[in-house]
């Protein structure tokens, strides 16, 4: 490890601050010292007595687009400042970097530039790595990972096989999100308002495809419950994930489709209980018995094969108020009706088109509600009542069961639909069973405080009590099941692209009928490859076109293979994995990046995990951040790790904007970090990114601000180099005199106030902007006392303490300048491996305090007292003030209120 003081540089008083000379010099030295940023080995550290506390600091790995942008600079400057501070406070720090290197842009570049994706990607990585080095970022490049290389993606394939063994990876035909511009499938999380997450102007289409899925829903409850313990994650992220998981408790209930001409056996019962439609809307009248009227469900001839409609409801307690059943236009029962009804078929086709347009516009929730009566009826299993079946354009086939029971009196959406089409609105929930219905506005939800009316044997019960009882009743009757549903769907990971991880499955042409002793094989000859066959390597000679389907399917040498079970001919899977697979576990690989026998060594991962501080954008809340939580739980269940969550703390930084908008090439407001570094230096560029705004807020980029920070650093350089020789001569550890001069006391007070402020801000507050502001105040305090220093009023020990501390305080934010000044002052060792200054509370205490004095609550004057004065001293100072004496002359002070260190208030008459 480099010892900066051994370079022997002499102070350079009189020279101007030149980052163009300083920064390349230090980066060359740091590059030559390959172990400079290396963490101590987990096995060595964990066994030592009094071992350093570990600190895993990680910024989200970037996609290698070829150029860093200012958002990257801000993200990495935050992590770098934290990592350097943790080194200086005695931690064993892991601070790695890698590349999320698979993805569509490489294929687009291949089309545009006729450059192979691998060549384009690796070239971009080299360019961005060079930029990161130029920024002076403290990454341990020995742990670097690149997800598009076989030594990484073979473990994606290994995990896929392990999930397949456990039933967590499976294949099915389903309706998927299709981006016509990407020519591939998108996961639900990658559809933003009906548009592709990559192409914000491209509407997403719905297609039926056979895809591979990962069973993330098996972990839905744990993913949701875990959010309550993740106090180190932003509330916004936790809320977004909870909403995305979307847990709903309720029941599945079966409504049998009535055969044509079937009588309504509940009509007489309703007539006995109510006379006329007007009475039906009343409250408080008890209904008759609720014995479920069950009918044979195998009478397919009379039933036209329509069978049963299953609905999911969170309010089974309102089922006596169901006045229709509504189907999505793509529901199988709706399609069955349409086979013999051309009018209905036309309506369904039109509704599907409406839904498609609404999805494309990202406004499926705002679609104008439209429905059509089928002329058919469903039977309410709780009372045998026949209710009309409608097809409605706002019911979605892929949400819930694609069917609802409509209870317009107690659901806003149902109320709107029923009002439009004149459907019956029947009240079955009231605020109080004895309360007059006058003034009750519909729809009325009443789940928390409502009671049931006109609901058979459950009349008079609270809604919450009835929900549990009625769900159990449905289960006992064989027409329902209490259940929990989720908005979260299984993760579709198949992508019809080339530049991704090959899926390690083959399709045997023999289908394996009668193969003895072979592994379990799905119908149709789906066979997992053995681990010995990994990695399945991407072929390099692939024609990238804009045609649909996977490019790998056009490479016979890749597609045609042999079955690992029977040795017969087989075809490889030609889809590749979603690139979010790569980023779901990458941070574990950093702990053991060169392991060729396993994804990582469990002991090393268990030492470093969970990540102590993870840093990245909030836009990843329901993509990367939820997938990585799922992957962590799977790895735990595989016995690879002990932790259940990947990161203890998450910080989501704000965006960098310019001219009021996020930087983008299309807006012409992109600022190049290279240009800023060339003009102002890396220290000024990254320090401005930390200073201009609190890190969790958006930052409005102003080049004048970078210039201002550069001028500040020049002032630091001037004042430190002026006294560097004196500091070098003073050495370290010489005791201060017992009595300090006024100049010494003043500058030490500001110094230790600054140290205390920075220590507080690094303890989780993340107020780097105020850290830097405090350093600026300290520098101003030193410069203000430059004359006193020149006059010898500041002793050598104090001078050494002040200037060495200043440079150490600066080190996390401006590492190049700190290293240069540390060397010039003769500092020992590496500046950011030197212990960070500790605050001295006595020295930080103000010498004097200004105390407002009030008379009858109105400010009269301000008096100065020694810091720490007691009540009597404060009272004496107030009473001795000339303005106070003039105001109270001839009056009586009836009460004196003293707030120690804050205020004196005299009450006079």
Q: Can you annotate each of these PLM segments?
A:
Residues 1-9, 256-308, 512-523, 726-738:
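Intrinsic disorder/low-complexity segments
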Residues 2-6, 16, 24-25, 29-37, ...:
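Residue patterns forming the tRNA-binding/recognition surfaces of aminoacyl-tRNA synthetases
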Residues 3, 7-58, 87-96, 119-129, ...:
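Conserved oxyanion/phosphate-binding beta-strand-loop segments in alpha/beta enzyme cores
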Residues 7-13, 60-68, 110, 140-145, ...:
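Glycine- and acidic
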Residues 15-27, 31, 156-262, 301-430, ...:
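NTP-handling and nucleic-acid-processing catalytic cores
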Residues 44-115, 144-159, 313-314, 381-417, ...:
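N-terminal catalytic cores of NTP/NDP-binding nucleotidyl/phosphoryl-transfer enzymes
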Residues 100, 165-166, 170-177, 247, ...:
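Helix-rich, typically C-terminal accessory recognition domains appended to large enzymatic cores
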Residues 376-382, 386-399, 553, 559-695:
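Alpha-helical recognition segments enriched in aromatics with Gly/Pro capping
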């Amino acid at each position: 490890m480099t010892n900066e003081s051994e370079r022997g540089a002499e102070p350079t008083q009189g020279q101007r601050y030149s980052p163009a000379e300083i920064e390349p010099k230090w980066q060359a030295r740091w590059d030559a010292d390959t172990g400079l940023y290396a963490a101590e080995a987990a096995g060595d550290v964990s066994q030592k007595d009094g071992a350093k506390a570990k600190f895993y600091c990680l910024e989200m790995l970037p996609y290698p687009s070829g150029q860093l942008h200012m958002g990257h600079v801000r993200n990495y400057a935050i992590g770098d400042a934290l990592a350097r501070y943790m080194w200086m406070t005695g931690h064993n720090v892991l601070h790695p970097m890698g590349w999320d290197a698979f993805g569509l842009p490489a294929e687009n570049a291949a089309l545009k530039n006729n450059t192979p994706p691998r060549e384009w990607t690796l070239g971009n990585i080299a360019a961005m790595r060079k930029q990161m080095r130029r920024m002076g970022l403290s990454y341990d490049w020995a742990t670097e990972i690149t997800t598009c290389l076989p030594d990484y993606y073979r473990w994606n394939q290994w995990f896929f096989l392990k999930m397949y063994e456990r039933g967590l990876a499976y294949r099915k035909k389903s309706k998927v999100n299709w981006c016509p511009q990407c020519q591939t499938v998108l996961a639900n999380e990658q559809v933003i308002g009906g548009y592709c997450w990559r192409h914000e102007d491209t509407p997403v289409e719905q297609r039926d495809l056979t895809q591979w899925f990962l069973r993330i829903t098996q972990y839905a409850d744990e993913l949701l419950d875990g959010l309550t313990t993740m106090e180190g994650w932003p509330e916004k992220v936790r809320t977004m994930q909870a909403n995305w998981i979307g847990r709903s408790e309720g029941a599945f209930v079966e409504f049998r489709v009535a055969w044509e001409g079937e009588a309504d056996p509940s009509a007489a019962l309703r007539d006995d209980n109510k006379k006329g439609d007007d009475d039906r809307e009343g409250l408080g009248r008890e209904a008759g018995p609720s014995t479920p009227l069950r009918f044979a469900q195998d009478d397919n001839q009379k039933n036209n094969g329509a069978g049963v409609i299953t609905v999911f409801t969170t309010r089974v307690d309102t089922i006596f108020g169901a006045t229709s059943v509504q189907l999505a236009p793509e529901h199988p029962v709706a399609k069955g009706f349409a086979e013999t009804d051309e009018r209905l078929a036309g309506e369904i086709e039109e509704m599907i088109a409406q839904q498609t347009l609404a999805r494309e516009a990202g406004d499926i929730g705002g679609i104008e509600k439209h429905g059509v009566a089928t002329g058919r009826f469903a039977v309410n299993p709780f009372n045998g009542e026949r209710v009309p079946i409608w097809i409605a354009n706002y019911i979605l086939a892929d949400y819930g069961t694609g069917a609802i029971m409509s209870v317009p009196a107690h659901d806003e959406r149902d109320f709107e639909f029923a009002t439009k089409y004149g459907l019956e609105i029947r009240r079955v929930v009231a605020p109080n069973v004895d309360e007059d219905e006058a003034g009750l506005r519909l729809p009325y939800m009443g789940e928390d405080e409502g009671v049931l009316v006109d609901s058979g044997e459950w009349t008079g019960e609270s809604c919450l009590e009835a929900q549990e009882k009625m769900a159990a009743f449905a289960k006992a009757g064989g027409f329902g099941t209490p259940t929990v549903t989720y908005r979260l769907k299984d993760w579709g990971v198949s992508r019809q692209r080339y530049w991704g991880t090959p899926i390690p499955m083959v399709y045997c042409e023999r289908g394996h009928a009668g193969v003895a002793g072979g592994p379990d094989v799905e119908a149709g000859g789906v066979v997992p490859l053995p681990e010995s066959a990994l990695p399945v390597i991407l072929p390099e000679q692939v024609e990238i076109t804009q045609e649909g389907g996977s490019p790998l399917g056009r490479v016979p040498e890749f597609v045609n293979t042999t079955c690992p079970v029977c040795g017969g001919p087989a075809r490889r899977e030609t889809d590749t994995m979603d690139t979010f697979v790569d980023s779901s576990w990458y941070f574990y690989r950093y702990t053991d990046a060169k392991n060729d026998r396993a994804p990582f060594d469990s002991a090393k991962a268990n030492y470093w995990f969970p990540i102590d501080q993870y840093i990245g954008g909030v836009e990843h809340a329901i993509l990367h951040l939820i997938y990585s939580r799922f992957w962590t739980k799977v790895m735990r269940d595989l016995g690879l790790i002990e932790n259940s969550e990947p990161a203890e703390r998450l910080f989501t930084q704000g965006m960098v904007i310019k001219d009021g908008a996020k930087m983008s090439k299309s807006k012409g407001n992109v600022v190049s970090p290279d240009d800023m570094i060339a003009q102002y230096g890396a220290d000024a560029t990254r320090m401005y990114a930390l200073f201009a705004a609190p890190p969790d807020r958006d930052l409005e980029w102003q080049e004048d601000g970078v210039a201002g920070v550069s001028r500040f650093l020049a002032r630091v350089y001037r004042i430190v180099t002026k006294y560097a020789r004196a500091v070098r001569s003073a050495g370290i550890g010489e005791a201060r005199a017992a009595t300090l001069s006024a100049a010494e006391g003043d500058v030490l007070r500001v110094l230790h106030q600054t140290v205390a402020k920075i220590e507080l801000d690094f303890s989780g507050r993340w107020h780097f902007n105020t850290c830097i502001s405090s350093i600026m105040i300290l520098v101003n305090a030193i410069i203000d006392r430059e004359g006193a220093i020149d006059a010898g009023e500041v002793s050598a020990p104090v001078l050494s303490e002040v200037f060495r501390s200043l440079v150490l305080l600066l080190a996390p934010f401006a590492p190049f300048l700190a290293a240069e000044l540390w060397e010039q002052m003769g500092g020992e060792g590496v500046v950011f491996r030197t212990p960070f200054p500790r605050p001295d509370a006595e020295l930080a205490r103000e010498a004097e305090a200004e105390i407002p004095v009030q008379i009858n609550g109105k400010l009269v004057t301000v008096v100065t007292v020694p810091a720490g004065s007691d009540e009597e001293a404060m009272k004496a100072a107030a009473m001795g003030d000339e303005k106070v004496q003039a105001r109270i002359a001839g009056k009586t002070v009836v009460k004196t209120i003293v707030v120690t260190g804050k205020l004196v208030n005299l009450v006079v008459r």
